[in-house]
Amino acid sequence: MSKKLIGIAALVAALALTAFVLTGCGSSGSSSAASASGDSASAAASESAESASASAEAEGSGVFRTLDEIKDSGKIVIGVFSDKHPFGYVDEGGEYAGYDVELANRLAKDLGVEVEYVSTEAANRVEYLETGKVDVILANFTVTAERAEKVDFCDPYMNVALGVVSHNDNVITDLSQIGENDEVIVITGTTAETYLTENNPDIKLQKFETYANAKTAFENKEAVAWANDNTEVIAFANGAEGYTVGIEELGSLDTIAPAVSKGNTTLLEWINQDMESLGAEKFFHAAYEKTLLDVYGADYEDTLVVEPGQ
């Protein structure tokens, strides 16, 4: 090979080697930049997550609204029944009314905010608090240990037990009268459902999600009896002909109270303080006489009403 050709070959080889080295450096530099960028993004994400976690710890669960947040919004959201006279229902004028609603209105007034009502069914009461759909539940809510694991109960304002209403042509005065083919109506999510399931598993239960559907089924004689809070079955029987509350107290004596989301301490404490003030002014006796007297009469007043702090 001539010297000229050897020189050309050497030049080509040198250029190729240079290109390889430069390409390698460029690739290495790009990889380092990507790595640095990834490390930076990872650090930023970590810092953001830590910040969000710290913020969540400072503000609570993020599900409920604190007392200050409710005040700042100018509105408190309260879950009540819309079809359960005389505790929570919508009257002929389209307004919420009833014993529970009297307390709800007063709490909003004392807090200095408007009230927004959200209609609830018995089975939704815990869920609405757990998801933050409402700030407070005021829907004939019986205090139980099981529920207290999921929500925080305020001080009670009413006494309650379970009761059983039946048709006048077959009055049930003892659960032993219920035959193996008979059914008892209950509403899903109530203490009546829990009690009968645990203590009388042989009794067949016909379950309904809503009070209105349970009432209609019972009126149509789809079951021999209807078990619910005694306050509710007494109200039902007193408001219609053909029914008798043969069992006025079943199980233990319990209480009814407002409930807030688990851990919402600021709202819980404020409600308890306000209810203690209401107890001092006999607010709950006044509310009874306004909304419940025509249903239960004067004889039940001191038995049912609880004045917090008194």
Where do the model's predicted regions map?
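Bacterial lipoprotein signal-peptidase II cleavage site
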Residues: 7, 21-43
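Flexible hinge/capping segments at coil-to-helix
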Residues: 166-183
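Extracytoplasmic small-molecule ligand-binding "clamshell" domains
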Residues: 58-140
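Short helix-initiation/N-cap motifs at beta->coil->alpha
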Residues: 116-128, 171, 188-191, 206-220
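A ligand-binding cleft/hinge motif common to bilobed small-molecule-binding domains
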Residues: 127, 141-149, 197-198, 219-220, ...
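Extended ligand-binding regions for polar small-molecule ligands
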Residues: 26, 101-110, 169, 189-190, ...
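Periplasmic-binding protein-like
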Residues: 159-166, 234-275, 294-310
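Ligand-binding clefts/hinges and TM-proximal coupling segments of bilobed small-molecule sensing domains
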Residues: 27, 58-61, 191-208, 245-249, ...
